[in-house]
Regions:
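Conserved N-terminal phosphate-binding loop of PLP-dependent enzymes in the Aspartate aminotransferase
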Residues: 2-431
Length: 431
């Protein structure tokens, strides 16, 4: 935010926030007249109201009141190169001038597919769609077409999009089409697979829980589940929508097996809506229109603008770029802990590459459900305090870095985090 805003100290972080964001409040009121939450994504909603942005440039976002924020959310980790990254802007703009979509093939789609097949070890063929949720649906259709079965198994605290069944499965609730088991519990997963082996078309797992507090599985868990799937003809699907940014070949490159299918999204669209399903050629063949066992289609699937932007994004996410964003996140982790210690606060963190989550209690190593966090009230107030210091994290206490950021900027972020903690202390938000 502006310097004047940053030195503001009123009765609470909430009041500081409201005084600095009157334009966002006005847009919230206007939006509520025609939309349920003045937006289309619940993930960024927070009280008293979310910000309304005007533009993004590089590492920064600018709201309608003219306040500047360091973008530590990257549109849910998807903008790995920051906002309006020039190579992506150039690629998308050039394609826009030639057309946005048509009922025929396009060369950028094939070029992006070639890049992904060359880069990701488990992918021999790939299909594109328009979101991670669509990618899940497409993969499930492929698995059903291949196996003739209907149900799927996922992890409690897992996330594979916003379909009703996946939302329930993430909460550990069984339904007519889905089953779930605790993430990392090999015995529980194998028991469900054995009990329902004749019903299961697919098992979906993340190599790291993107919405579950960045929890990593215990050694051998993924392989044991994969081997059980192989024994019973069940399609094993690895969800790398979030984790592709963590290594040149995604986290799948560190596994000692290759999943049957892989879900992709976020960074492969260069900031445009995108999803993808890749995997073994024999599995993807079930959507061949000459002998279809499952349907793959969509009005904007594989559109040339998204594909051109995605190719630029993937091309510029080199091993060196990934090392850079990982180092910046490590710098933030150390800095956040140091600032918390200076304030006499115990801060716990989880960092996987360029993804960092922070907690005001010891979360252990297992999955985290945001709704059950004992520090949720503090996190909500800290979020507003960070916004008032010109920092834009995810409301659920997570941040990420982008390739356009620098070490010097991370120093500023750490300083802003320290000032946000001071705000909480001054107004009784954290003892």
């Amino acid at each position: 935010m502006t310097e004047d805003t940053r030195i503001m100290r009123n009765t609470s972080p909430e009041q500081d926030y409201q005084l600095a964001t009157e334009g966002s409040a006005a847009w919230e009121k206007r939006g509520r007249a025609v939309m349920p939450i003045a937006g289309s994504r619940a993930i960024f909603f927070h009280l008293p109201y979310p910000l309304t942005m005007d533009r993004g440039e590089g590492a920064f976002l600018y709201d309608v009141d003219g306040n500047r924020y360091v973008d530590l959310a990257a549109n849910m980790f998807s903008l790995v190169h920051g906002n309006a990254f020039p190579p992506i802007v150039a690629a998308a703009s050039a394609q826009l001038a030639r057309g946005t979509a048509w009922p025929a093939n396009n060369s950028p789609q094939i070029e992006l597919a070639e890049a992904l097949v060359a880069r990701l070890p488990a992918i021999e063929r790939v299909l594109f769609c328009n979101s991670g949720t669509e990618a899940f649906s497409l993969a499930l259709n492929i698995a059903r077409g291949r196996t003739g079965r209907y149900r799927f198994l996922m992890a409690e605290a897992g996330y594979h999009g916003t379909m009703w069944d996946t939302a329930l499965g993430g909460k550990g609730k069984e339904g007519p089409t889905h089953l779930s088991a605790p993430y990392g519990d090999t015995e529980a997963f194998l028991a469900v697979i054995e009990r329902h082996r004749h019903e299961l078309a697919a098992v979906f797992l993340e190599p790291m829980l993107g919405s579950g507090g960045f929890a990593l599985p215990p050694a051998g868990f993924l392989r044991a589940v994969y081997e059980a799937c192989q024994r019973h003809g069940i399609v094993f699907v690895l969800d790398e929508v979030v984790t592709f940014r963590l290594a040149p070949g995604g986290l799948q490159a560190s596994l000692d097996f290759q999943p049957d299918l892989v879900l992709l999204g976020k960074i492969i669209g260069g900031g445009f809506p995108v999803g993808g399903v890749g995997g073994k050629a024999e599995l993807l063949a079930v959507v061949d229109p000459q002998a279809p066992r499952a349907l793959a289609s969509g009005t904007f699937s594989g559109n040339p603008v998204t594909m051109a932007a995605g190719l630029a994004s993937v091309t510029h996410l080199t091993a060196a770029a990934i090392a850079h964003i990982d180092a910046l996140a490590a710098q933030l982790e150390a800095g956040f802990k140091a600032e918390a210690a200076r304030h006499g606060i115990a801060l716990f963190t989880r960092r996987v590459g360029s993804l960092l989550a922070y907690f005001f209690y010891d979360p252990g190593t297992g999955p985290i459900a945001m709704g059950s966090r004992p520090d949720s009230e503090v996190i909500q107030r800290l979020h507003l305090a960070m916004l008032s210091e010109g920092l834009f994290p995810l409301p659920r206490a997570a941040v990420t870095t982008s390739t356009v950021m620098t070490e010097a900027l991370m120093v500023e972020v750490v300083q802003g985090f320290g000032r946000a903690l001071t705000r909480l202390r001054d107004f009784g938000g954290r003892d």
